[in-house]
Structures are given as structure tokens and as C-alpha cells.
Amino acid sequence: MKPSLIFSQYVWLVNTLRRYGRMTLEEINDKWQDDEVADGNPLSRSTFNRHRDAVLDMFGVIIECDTQDGYRYYIDNPEVLDDDTLERWMLNSLTVGAVLADSQSIHDRILLENVPAGEEHLQTLIQAIKTSHKVEICYARFGHSGYNIYVAPYALKLWHQRWYLLSSNGKYLITYSLDRMRSVKVLDQTFKLPEGFSAEAYFSEFYGVLTDNEVPLKHIRVRAYGQTPNYMRTLPFHSSQKEVETTDNYSDFTFDIRPTYDFLNALSSGGPDLEILEPKELRKEMKDWLQSSLDKYKDE
């Protein structure tokens, strides 16, 4: 069996249990045989058990059997597939990959976003992170020639279709974009991750990958108009986002965040449909920023 089909079967099993909830093996098999993923074969108990083990290894998803409820199978830890988890991202990626693989006949009608280079360094960096080895990177900032850096790789983050490496040079934590890396070499020298370090906690007070601890943490209130509240509900700007007021004309959201350039840029992209209400100094900063942009059009 082709590896791509096997992965599709793993994804199918997880998504089926997520969609339909508790199911007996017979019920799962009925759904299985109605789908192309079955490849014309019924789902035997041995195949189901192998896939069940593989799903645990690959996604960390535990499929349990409730012997008190007619031997129905269910996902025992659905929280592992919550937003912003590696397991959720892997499942979504494989799900999309499986769907696209079955859609070659209409490939010219499925348009994908261009993704910058850099993925070729992922495997090397992941290996270095797993084994706690430092790396040598030939890095080229925009408009500059390449230069070598020697860092301890702490974590990887995917943001707006770009991969970033959070690393330490021994004094500071620095984030590098993988698409600006010309080469990556794993060194023999090892490093020790600081006790209690959490990449999620490190980025938790910021929007995106640009971090600056000199920017104070602020409680921010934003008013959204039109359809923007719906977009913010379905895809929150930040984990601290809360909807605190809802009316027919607008909705107010609050954030507890350090408002760096990335966050202000994201708010400004909302145009007239996003307005900073508080704090007043941040409202003025945004006003000055927008005025600066408007000044560029004064000659028209």
C-alpha cells in the first residue's frame, strides 16, 4: 500500500471519530467502506488496531473503547487537537494533502498561496533541537550579504506562511527567518535548555514573532465594525482576546499584550473597521501612524 494512502487512512480515522463521536467498530467500518480511503477493502480489527496505534504515535490522539457502552470507540483526549498545537497542525496539513491528492483533475482550479523558501532547513533544525546541538547558520538579511551565526536552537514557530527559529547566542534570545538562511550545519557542541523554558510562554505576550520586552504589557480595547467582529471571532488575533461588548453596530474586544509593530500593523490592516479605544496613548500612536501614511498621498 502506498504510504500516502496509509497516512490518509490515519487522518480519516481521526476525523471520523471527531465528526461522529462514539462509534462501534462495525459503524466505523460502514463509513470506511463508503469512502475511497478504504481502497476496496473492509476495515479489519487488526488493521483498525494498527491504525489506532499509529494515530497515537503520530498525533498523540488516544482512541479508547468504552466496554460499558456497547464497545464504542472515542477520542479520549480531544484537547490535543485544540488550536495552536503541533498535532492539530499536522492533522490539518495531512487532511489538506489527502484532499488535494484526490483532486488532480481540477488542479488548475485550486489556487494556493506562495510560501517562501526555508522548509529545506526544517529537518536539520528539528534534529538539532531534539539532540540539543548548536548550529552554524549562514544568514542573509534583506539587502545584506550573508554572514555566519552560531546559536543554540530553542524552538520553531510558523507565522503567516513563514518559519522562524527562536535561538540563543549566549546573551540574548533572537528570532531568525528560515527563508533568509542559506545553509544550516549541526555542530558537535551541545547546549542545555534553561530550566522551565517554554516557547509558548515566551511568545504569549506578543503578536507574531517580533518580541521586545521594553514594550510594556498593556490592556487594550479595540472596537470592530461591519463584518470584522465575525472574522475576529473565528480567527482571534491573540490568545488573550476577549469579546466584552456586542451591539448591532459594533463589538468591542480586549487584549492583554505588548503592542509591538506587528500588532499595530495587524490592527491597521483593518482600516476603518478597527479602532483602538484604550489606552489613549496607544490610540494616539495609531492615529499618528495612520496620519503618516495619509501624508504620503497629500499631493493627489
Regions found by a protein language model. Name each.
Residues 1-85, 292-300:
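Short, basic/aromatic recognition patches that contact phosphate-bearing ligands
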Residues 11, 25, 53, 60, ...:
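Bulky hydrophobic/aromatic content
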Residues 13, 48, 132, 222, ...:
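A residue-level signal for conserved active-site and pocket-lining positions in enzyme catalytic cores
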Residues 22, 150, 175, 254, ...:
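Short aromatic/basic micro-patch
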Residues 63, 156, 184, 243-244:
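A structural signal for short hydrophobic beta-strand segments in well-ordered beta-sheet cores
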Residues 72, 136, 164-166, 252, ...:
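General beta-strand recognition
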Residues 109-221:
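Core beta-strand-centered patch of the WYL/Sm-like small regulatory domain
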Residues 204-300:
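Polybasic (Lys/Arg-rich)
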